[in-house]
Design a protein with these regions (language model features):
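FIC/Doc superfamily catalytic core
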Residues: 1-311
Length: 311
């Protein structure tokens, strides 16, 4: 009944109690944009050709690790390029090469700690031709390194937003690493601290988070939790242009809490799948079929085990 009401736009939530500090209309609208994408994650980045590189990226990381275990040396960047660039005369190669540089130039840093403001600076500097700067900073000329290591936004508001985001990124929480990576990523997209291309930088930051923690894909958690955020999403959307910012910000908080809970539950389900894998492997060994355990990785990588079909 709730889903039907939400689909018809007739669902009604209780009136907001307070604003709890979320007063920035631009931030809230950015959150809503991300929420709409998350509610159908398979198509969230469908308009961005770079999304096609995500799966090959993770595959190349795994392939490189396997080759190194065999004592062979391989350049991860060249391996990745060979996977996604079949035609080296492609006019988009400059953008793709910058995108890959942004990933691999920051990969070592990401592996050694959380994503920080310095990581953002490193990623932005991989696209000097795009004129990316901090939001509300004076516009600078293109074709130059825009953000030096000690650069910080001129705007005090943007400084505060970034400082809070970095603190959240560094906090050790009782969350699955994937959950924390996703929420940190959502937080960055919400504040959108750059004057342009926040979406592209956000995608790269997410990939760095996943690479640093050896996480393969964000899809399972969000697919499993998709239905649980629909109610809150419609509640906010219905009131977006009808209420003052301070009135509907509690709905955003409600949605974010619901999303966090949904992802946490999905993380628990993924953990149970890992336990099932270990139990299955132990059982096969116990009954004398240890050789069959070699097939388990293939079985457990089936989409039914990784997306939303268990929900």
């Amino acid at each position: 009944e709730i889903r039907r009401a939400a689909a018809q736009g007739t669902i009604s939530l209780p009136p907001p109690a307070n604003s709890e500090g979320l007063e920035d209309l631009a931030v809230l609208k950015s959150c809503l944009k991300v929420i709409r994408e998350l509610s159908g994650f398979r198509y969230a980045f469908a308009k961005d050709a770079m999304a096609e590189t995500f799966a090959p990226l993770m595959a190349s990381v795994e392939a490189k690790n396997e080759l190194e275990r065999q004592g062979l040396k391989v350049s991860l960047k060249s391996y990745f390029l060979s996977l996604i660039l079949k035609d080296l005369e492609n006019p988009d190669i400059l953008l793709i090469d910058n995108y890959i540089n942004a990933l691999f130039n920051s990969a070592n840093e990401a592996a050694n700690g959380p994503i920080t403001v310095q990581t953002v600076v490193n990623v932005v500097n991989s696209f000097p031709q795009d004129g990316i700067n901090w939001r509300e900073n004076p516009q600078t000329d293109e074709e130059q390194i825009l953000l030096q290591p000690d650069t910080f936004p001129d705007s005090k508001a943007v400084q505060v937003e970034l400082a809070r985001w970095e603190k959240y990124s560094k906090e050790l929480r009782d969350l699955d690493p994937l959950v924390h990576a996703l929420l940190t990523n959502l937080y960055f997209m919400a504040i959108s601290p750059l004057n342009r291309h926040n979406g592209r930088v956000t995608q790269i930051l997410l990939q760095l988070s996943l690479m640093g923690q050896n996480i393969n894909s964000p899809a399972p958690c969000l697919m499993l939790g998709r239905a649980l955020i629909t109610n809150a999403h419609f509640g906010i959307e219905e009131r977006l242009y009808g209420l003052r910012t301070r009135q509907w910000s509690p709905y955003l908080q409600y949605m974010l809490k619901t999303l966090s809970k949904a992802i946490l539950l999905s993380g628990e389900l993924l953990a149970s799948l890992q336990r099932l894998y270990a139990q299955t492997e132990a059982y096969l060994k116990m009954i004398g079929l240890a050789s069959h355990a070699a097939f388990l990785p293939v079985i457990f990588k089936h989409p039914a085990c990784r997306t939303g079909e268990f929900s």
